[in-house]
Regions:
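His/Glu-rich zincin catalytic helix
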Residues: 1-64, 172-274, 313, 398-412
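Charge-rich, well-structured scaffold segments of protease-associated domains
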Residues: 63-213, 245, 278-279, 284-412
Length: 412
């Protein structure tokens, strides 16, 4: 993959380009960094994303969708915690048409009172439906205590009250805030580097946004040693937990190895073996590193019977404390190295999967091939270095915990 650029739009916009003619298909992404849900009023980014699934002001949803479907074009807006953007995946023969449709969408999005009301109703219905998804509830409750009074405390959808209070002016303000200073373009597949008809059309799409001033994502740190419980009618207890994980850049490969051994590796990982296999206290138990531009943390979860919730949580805490105090064994390190090295080719089975890895490396500010270099560091990681790292990061034992169960509080 190479980095090209678009110019004459108020500044330079990076273009991540990769030619691969193994399939007659093209993937396009326009990504606005520092423009996702945590950068906006609660619920607004997700609502705007869903409004963009309702066609244009002149081509309503059914007609717009039909024109895409007859050509097997996948065109959609997407919204994450940190990013907002558009994606196209289609056959090469329909790519120019797909770009035309995206140009129509960004030129006259269907931001009307009617569509706003419709989408608000749909999102509120979704929120109500998810209120009985206790994994979702436990995760949301965890974020509310771990990141209280920050945008990280809320999920992409927001609360019903947040959604109901969104006005059309909020939608237009968010849309106007998408600027090219924070954007990049990804273009990969069966396409030439110098194919001007495509580049010109993409430039027309970019020109619909102002260049603006680059924004940086805010940083958030998880709180420690907090607990919340919500009593519900359920046959199971849902336990979610997190802790801050203050890792510097040159330690990331060590952190990933450590977390794989602790709880990210499924069967064979420390938590799964102790909590499920030996003690029989959970159906599953995981913990992994969550590293993003906005936060770095350990996050985990498990499900168990209501009557086992207290014992299961206590065992999780014991396992993590022991992990921090005593580290790992050489056998565990060797097994982690073998799995991580062996599974790496599976991440690159398709051309678009390889391109996605390169895009992720670019987004993280790394050079292309960073992941392979990191894997080499993992292969050469020695036990003493790993265990010293683990002992220096006992902050991961200071858990914030959210439980959703049928238990009374005094039984937890």
């Amino acid at each position: 993959m190479k980095i090209l650029k678009f110019e004459n739009l108020g500044g330079e916009i990076p273009l991540l380009f990769e030619n691969d003619a193994s399939l007659p298909a093209i993937k396009f992404r326009l990504v606005f960094r520092a423009s996702g849900a945590i950068c906006a009023k609660n619920g607004v980014a997700n609502l705007v994303c869903q409004m963009l699934d309702n066609g244009t002001a002149s081509l309503k949803k059914a007609e717009f969708a039909s024109l895409l479907e007859t050509r097997a074009i996948n065109l959609q807006a997407f919204c994450g915690a940190e990013t907002f953007g558009f994606e196209i995946l289609c056959l090469k023969e329909h790519f120019l048409y797909a770009l035309d449709m995206l140009l129509k969408l960004v030129d006259e999005p269907n931001f009307s009172d009617e569509i706003l009301a419709k989408v608000k109703d749909e999102i509120c219905a979704e929120i109500l439906d998810l209120s009985s998804d206790f994994d979702e509830v436990a995760n949301d409750n965890l974020n509310k205590i771990a990141f209280a009074n920050t945008p990280m405390a809320f999920n992409l959808r927001g609360e019903i009250a947040d959604v109901e209070n969104i006005a059309l002016s909020d939608v237009r303000e968010f849309w106007a805030g998408l600027n090219l200073a924070n954007a990049y373009v990804f273009l990969g597949g069966d396409i030439g580097e110098n194919d001007e008809k495509f580049r010109q059309k993409i430039a027309q799409i970019l020109a619909k946004f102002k260049f603006g001033v680059a924004r940086n994502l805010p940083k958030f740190t998880s709180k420690s040693d907090l607990f919340t419980h919500q009593k519900v009618q359920s046959e199971q207890a849902f336990i979610y937990f997190c802790a801050p994980f203050d890792v510097c850049e040159d330690e990331l490969f060590i952190a990933k190895t450590a977390m794989f051994i602790l709880g990210g590796g499924g069967f064979g990982s420390r938590l799964m073996e102790e909590v499920r296999v030996r003690a029989g206290l959970a159906y599953s138990c995981y913990a992994m590193a969550k590293f993003s531009h906005a936060t770095r943390m350990l996050k985990g979860y498990l499900q168990t019977k209501n009557e086992n919730a207290k014992d299961a949580l206590n065992l999780v805490k014991k396992v993590i404390n022991d992990f921090c105090e005593n580290g790992v064994t050489q056998d565990e390190l060797d097994a982690a190295k073998a799995f991580l090295a062996g599974s790496n080719p599976l991440r690159k089975e398709t051309a678009f999967a390889k391109m996605a890895i390169c895009e992720s490396e670019f987004y993280d500010g790394k050079e292309f091939g960073f992941g392979d270099k990191e894997l080499e560091k993992i292969k050469n990681l020695d036990l003493q270095t790993l265990n010293n790292f683990i002992k220096n990061h006992d902050e991961i034992s200071k858990l914030c915990v959210a439980i959703v169960s049928a238990n009374d509080d005094e039984n937890l």
